[in-house]
UniProtKB/Swiss-Prot annotation:
Basic and acidic residues bias: start-end ranges: 8-24
Record flagged with keyword Repeat: yes
Upper classification of the organism: Eukaryota, Metazoa, Chordata, Craniata, Vertebrata
Region (Disordered): 1-26
Protein's recorded name: Leucine-rich repeat-containing protein 40
Positions of LRR repeats: 35-58, 81-103, 104-126, 127-149, 150-172, 174-195, 196-219, 221-241, 242-266, 268-287, 288-310, 311-334, 336-356, 398-421, 424-447, 449-470, 471-494, 496-517, 519-540, 541-564, 566-587
Phosphoserine modified-residue sites: 71
Keywords in alphabetical order: Leucine-rich repeat, Phosphoprotein, Repeat
SUPFAM superfamilies: L domain-like
Length: 602
């Protein structure tokens, strides 16, 4: 907003202030001049112990250059300037803010996160135009009541402070859409929060909440509710009536039972990991028709209801670390991209099937549905034929599972007789794991028109031959626990590959060719020596939802990685970088990505 300087704010002695007293830390005049033109001033990361007076008075005092140059052109007239609307003074050492803050009434954005503030000035009430206020990562113990006077405020970030309570009158922030109170010391949430009728996103994670007010259900526009890492033992049944809710986070609490969700027909993600839930019934699932992500890991579930198969939109299901002994075969009819089952006492699915990943488990479950539909009392008994090489191949397994299995033989070569035995049979899966293979069998190319997944883990492969790159229908490739340090460029022809496991190899850089395989959904490259990743290229991998970089040599995580919003699971533990801190990593992928985005240079 360009305007002439208003008379009441003009100080005729302004040009002499600097000579009369110490003005404190200085700001380059070039920055101030640019700010008068653009209306924006960024002083982040300048080691400031206080805000220079010239910042507060940027639209009041006569600029220094006005005293030095009296022949202004029409584009340099100091009195025809822009009010400061955006002020960023984050990542400094500020312990307090002056009441002179009131001299910037046009501010719409004030970012003072990552300082040492213990309080906010009462003059903040005079910032009538303020729309976004970021005071996160400070040392605030209380909030001034004056903050509730900011009627135009839309975004308020207060995470990572020391707040124990919320001032009365918060409900007056009628325009507020995004409120982050995570990582404080709150024990209660005022019932009046329900009057925040415009709120779309509410983050209460990492506090000390033992319950939520039932009135929270009156937030009819709320889409994102995060209550992770609290002390919740129950959730008000009224939460199930929140019609606009899309994301609900309740991880790391003390929940034993779940509410029903009769009106949550927009709910896309339900995160319930690390609770004490013992039962999941049809009543909990029947209304979740839009659900994409269901995270139940680390609970005490003993069974999975058949009704889970009704969730036809479900893409990611995490049931790991429960007490589940069997799965309903109907799960095989789901269109899952990710299914986690580790840490369960499953008796009906072999470990090697689970190790091969989601699609193999679903395929196995579907095969069991067929078995159930046809009486197996007179089925063909499992038979085997002996090859001249003394290898044994299960003909029944090849015919029914379409699996060519020559695993755990400690073999250095795959016998030709094994390939000969499959000439008249459709093979979609190959398992040559746990051998001593130094190269990929050349005859694997004979199956290029049919094979979808290959397991070559636990061998001695030091390179990938071109034969593998010809299997263009491949969707799953397991190469973990080999001696690989690079991948050939020809692998870019694997245009249907969805999952690749490269863990426990010798990679020092993230394989460049993987950036060009746009179909990849999961890249597992933990326990290598990877020193860097390219966030710009990673962002172009639009289908990538799982990236495991644990236990590598990453000295820093580029902030731009936070722009890879397609990631649902990002694992970074066990690397030598210092930031993000372990506390951030523990909060999960969404928190890590947000942390990184906040540190992208303006």
């Amino acid at each position: 907003m360009s305007r002439h300087m208003r008379a009441p704010r003009f100080d005729p002695r302004a040009g002499f202030h600097a000579e009369g007293k110490d003005r404190g830390p200085s700001v380059p005049q070039g920055l101030l001049k640019a700010a008068r033109s653009s209306g924006q001033l960024n002083l982040a990361g300048r080691n400031l112990g206080e805000v220079p007076q010239c910042v507060w008075r940027i639209n009041v005092d006569i600029p220094e250059e006005a005293n030095q140059n009296l022949s202004f052109s029409s584009t340099e007239r100091w009195w025809d300037q822009t009010d400061l609307t955006k002020l960023i003074i984050s990542s400094n050492k500020l312990q307090s803010l002056s009441d002179d803050l009131r001299l910037l009434p046009a501010l719409t954005v004030l970012d003072i996160h990552d300082n040492q503030l213990t309080s906010l000035p009462s003059a903040i009430r005079e910032l009538d135009n303020l729309q976004k206020l970021n005071v996160s990562h400070n040392k605030l113990k209380i909030l001034p009541e004056e903050i509730t006077s900011l009627k135009n405020l839309r975004t308020l970030h207060l995470q990572h402070n020391e707040l124990t309570c919320i001032p009365e009158g918060f409900e007056h922030l009628s325009c507020l859409e995004d409120l982050d109170l995570s990582s404080n010391r709150l024990a209660t949430v005022p019932a009046d929060f329900a009057l925040l009728s415009s709120l779309l996103r509410l983050n209460l994670s990492s506090n000390q909440l033992k319950n939520l007010p039932a009135e929270i259900s009156r937030m009819k526009r709320l889409k994102h509710l995060d209550c992770d890492a609290n002390l919740l033992e129950t959730v008000p049944p009224d939460v199930g009536s929140m019609e606009s809710l899309e994301l609900l986070y309740l991880r790391r609490n003390k929940l034993r039972v779940l509410p029903e969700f009769p009106s949550c027909r927009q709910l896309k993600e339900l995160h319930l990991a690390e609770n004490q839930i013992e039962k999941l019934g049809a009543e909990h699932l029947q209304h979740l028709q839009a659900i994409l992500v269901l995270d139940l890991r680390g609970n005490k579930l003993r069974s999975v209801p058949e009704e889970m198969a009704l969730l036809q939109s479900l893409e990611r299901l995490d049931l790991s670390n429960n007490d589940i002994s069997s799965l309903p075969c109907s799960l095989g009819n789901l269109h899952l991209k990710f299914l986690a089952l580790e840490g369960n006492p499953l008796r009906t699915i072999r470990r090697e099937i689970i190790a091969k990943g989601t699609q193999e488990v679903l395929k196995y479950l579907r095969s069991k549905i067929k078995d159930d539909r046809t009486n197996q009392n007179d089925s063909v008994p499992e038979t085997a034929m002996t090859l001249p090489s003394e290898a044994r191949v299960n003909i029944h397994a090849i015919a029914t599972l379409k699996l060519l299995d020559y695993s755990d033989k400690q073999a250095t070569l795959i016998p030709d007789d094994l390939f000969d035995a499959t000439k008249t049979t459709l093979i979609t899966s190959i398992n040559f794991s746990k051998n001593q293979l130094c190269e990929i069998p050349q005859r694997i190319v004979e199956l290029k028109e049919m094979v979808l997944d290959i397991n070559l883990s636990f061998n001695k492969l030091s390179f990938i031959s071109h034969e593998l790159c010809l299997l263009q229908k491949l969707t799953f490739l397991d190469l973990r626990n080999n001696f690989l340090s690079s991948l050939p460029e020809e692998m870019s022809s694997l245009t249907k590959l969805q999952t690749i496991n490269l863990s426990f190899n010798r990679f020092k850089v993230f394989p460049e060719v993987l950036y060009r395989i746009s179909t990849l959904e999961a890249v597992l490259i933990s326990n290598n020596q990877v020193g860097s990743v390219d966030p710009q290229k990673m962002k172009l991998m639009e289908n990538l939802n799982t990236l495991d970089l644990q236990n590598n040599d990453l000295l820093q995580i580029p902030p731009e990685l936070g722009n890879c919003v397609q990631l649902r699971t990002l694992l970074l533990d066990g690397n030598p970088f210092r930031v993000p801190r372990a506390a951030i990593l523990m909060k999960g992928t969404a928190a890590v990505l947000e942390y990184l985005r906040d540190r992208i240079p303006a």
